[in-house]
């Protein structure tokens, strides 16, 4: 099996190694546009010899903004701003894909000025906020909104695009029977619950052409007692491959607890079993994310064929040049302790390690 520092091909894109910087909201955008702080952040990541950098989630619609500091991709006006981020990474020798993230039922009215939307009308379990059910026509429009956002991403010069379909955001909520209680073509069976995501991927492929890498961060199973099992998530991954998706980043879907996917006490990578199942089911590249800190764990995951690449985020918040330190054996592990202090700083419009 190829090692951590072997090249990886995703569609026509070749990245120099199998380390991925996974996306996270950074809270630093200014009115949806790239800030100077973000240019500096991504410029430093671009110098770090990371195989592929995935940006924080770009909102495909104004109503889908998940945080006040989120980047936008719902207007052509955003293209020159996004290009500054891309240029900063490319000047350092890196490659960058843009993630698209619609907050859906996780959005807050104080950010969007609107009632949050989702697959079904219900109350949000934490905030108590009433969620408005999207109509069929609105879903069709959202498919086009995602495709237009991906077109802007390509025009800004990004090397690829990733859809966020995990962590309870809009696409993830459609995949879960807990939040999707519809009885039409967009809900019910597992296949129908996947229709929104699949049609979005197909629409994006038509917009982007055959050679532009399309990736999906996919919640393979829900960490909720009434949620979807991993078997459904694996089948969704199969369908996405058939629809022209080029890579899957394995994560979790609906969360009973927001901090479930950022666990301080984990002693091993979180999603090994789910990733192994997906890797056995599809032929496109699979990324494993979640709690990976040690070089020997990374090498084990690759050597055993569990995944094709290793995704990390908090480690790069603390050490943007971690890849070079691992390559030269100056360290055997990230220094990150998963204290999650970076989350507190993010809420204040700054993405940084709280203990460095």
Region roles according to the model:
Residues 1-356:
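Flavin-dependent oxidoreductase catalytic cores
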